[in-house]
């Protein structure tokens, strides 16, 4: 199975390969810069080459880049929209440089513009990107708090339909659970993945953020827990990981570092739960 974690690129993006190996991962996710500031990736040719070579030699892949937390594709504000588009263009260009096939992004919040206008804003913003042929933008499912979009699978479908780009999807299990899609039992997992297939299509599911949830289903609260130890729980996680629809989908963890346990413990847990 392909499972890894979101790892640091401190000291150079090529260090992500070693960091991934250190936690037992064989695929993974990175930020190309601090996600809390507007900043373009600064990746030198030598470190990009070392990253590509290290990935090819030591990992199964694929990697995914997580875009900045400041990006808001749904915004009605022209200045924020322009910054979001510029930031996303820099990310897809960095992905091409690094040989990373995916850039993951949250749709953002409509901040009062309304769901339909927010979805239109997101689709049209994505249409302004010049995405390299070897890179795909993944729309991430959201927990659905406030005016954030992406919590409803229909939101994902609408953006994929309204945009002229060739887009796919990343499901975050904690987000989907918080948004009201139950994953705590085998029956619930079957129902949720069937619902996703009906609305979006499992052919669009290219990556999973595998996280348990510290809060109950439908609370719209986004706080991750160790695998099998949150409200999704061991039974739900086992059912999800072993579902036929997930068998070949790469899994990346964004689980907490607490109680003396980090990514290595959680990756081992995932492998233990895989039948």
Swiss-Prot record:
Enzymatic reactions: Endonucleolytic cleavage to 5'-phosphooligonucleotide end-products
InterPro entries for the chain: AP_endonuc_2 (IPR001719), AP_endonuc_F2_Zn_BS (IPR018246), Xyl_isomerase-like_sf (IPR036237), Xyl_isomerase-like_TIM-brl (IPR013022)
Keywords on record: DNA damage, DNA repair, Endonuclease, Hydrolase, Metal-binding, Nuclease, Zinc
Top-level lineage group: Archaea
Residues involved in Zn(2+) 1 binding: 66, 106, 140
UniProt xrefs under HAMAP family: Nfo (MF_00152)
Protein name, UniProt field: Probable endonuclease 4
Organism: Halobacterium salinarum (strain ATCC 700922 / JCM 11081 / NRC-1)
């Amino acid at each position: 199975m392909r499972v890894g974690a979101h790892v640091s690129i401190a000291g150079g993006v090529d260090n992500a390969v070693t960091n991934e190996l250190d936690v037992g991962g064989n695929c993974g996710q990175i930020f190309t810069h601090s996600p809390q500031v507007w900043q373009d990736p600064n990746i030198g040719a030598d470190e990009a080459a070392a990253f590509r070579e290290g990935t090819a030699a030591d990992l199964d892949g694929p990697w995914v880049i997580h875009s900045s937390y400041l990006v808001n594709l749904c915004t009605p504000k022209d200045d924020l929209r322009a910054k979001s588009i510029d930031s996303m263009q820099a990310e897809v260009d960095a992905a091409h440089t690094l040989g990373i096939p995916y850039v993951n992004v949250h749709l953002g919040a409509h901040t009062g513009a309304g769901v339909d206008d927010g979805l239109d804003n997101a689709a049209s913003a994505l249409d302004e990107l010049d995405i390299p042929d070897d890179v795909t933008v993944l729309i991430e499912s959201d927990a659905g708090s406030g005016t954030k979009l992406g919590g409803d699978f229909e939101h994902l479908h609408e953006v994929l339909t309204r945009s002229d780009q060739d887009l796919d999807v990343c499901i975050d299990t904690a987000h989907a659970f918080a948004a009201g899609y139950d994953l705590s039992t085998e029956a619930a997992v079957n129902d949720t993945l069937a619902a996703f297939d009906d609305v979006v299509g499992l052919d669009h599911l290219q990556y999973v953020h595998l996280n348990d949830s510290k809060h109950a289903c439908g609370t719209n609260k986004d706080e991750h827990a160790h695998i099998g130890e949150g409200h999704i729980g061991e039974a739900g996680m086992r059912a999800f990981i072993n579902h036929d629809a997930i068998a070949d989908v790469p899994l990346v963890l964004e689980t907490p570092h607490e109680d003396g346990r980090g990514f290595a413990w959680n990756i081992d847990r995932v492998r233990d739960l895989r039948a």
